[in-house]
Amino acid sequence: MIQMESLLKAADNSGARQVQCIKVLGGSKRRYAGIGDIVKVSVKDAIPRGRVKKGEVYNAVVVRSKRGVRRADGSQIRFDGNAAVLLNNNLQPIGTRVFGPVTRELRNERFMRIISLAPEVL
């Protein structure tokens, strides 16, 4: 469950290390974002010579969350931390690699490119 001010790990090689959620997209009263939801983020920590710089604002899709996601069969998948993949204005990934596992729920949310880049899909 991601809300404003939540810190997330960047799960790609865009150059960001840590990002902070500044808005949950999808309605003016929407408070929380889960796996597969798009959020507006600000880069809080970046590596030198990366594609993104500290302070820049991007769209991002949440790929892992501590809250997890419940499946239709009753099972639930949770992760140790919150992570997101940075997106450009066309909602395409900025990075060329995705680190760590992602869930199958991204397939429904038109993020097939992230699914194909991920090393493991749960």
UniProtKB/Swiss-Prot annotation:
GO BP annotation list? translation
Give the record's GO CC terms.
Answer: cytosolic large ribosomal subunit
Q: Keywords for this entry?
A: Ribonucleoprotein, Ribosomal protein, RNA-binding, rRNA-binding
Q: Name one GO molecular function term.
A: large ribosomal subunit rRNA binding
UniProt cross-references to Pfam families, sorted A to Z: Ribosomal_L14
Q: Which family does it belong to?
A: Belongs to the universal ribosomal protein uL14 family.
Tell me the function of this protein: Binds to 23S rRNA. Forms part of two intersubunit bridges in the 70S ribosome.
The UniProt subunit note reads as follows: Part of the 50S ribosomal subunit. Forms a cluster with proteins L3 and L19. In the 70S ribosome, L14 and L19 interact and together make contacts with the 16S rRNA in bridges B5 and B8.
Q: What is this protein called?
A: Large ribosomal subunit protein uL14
Species name for this entry? Answer: Halorhodospira halophila (strain DSM 244 / SL1)
Q: What gene, per UniProt, encodes this protein?
A: rplN
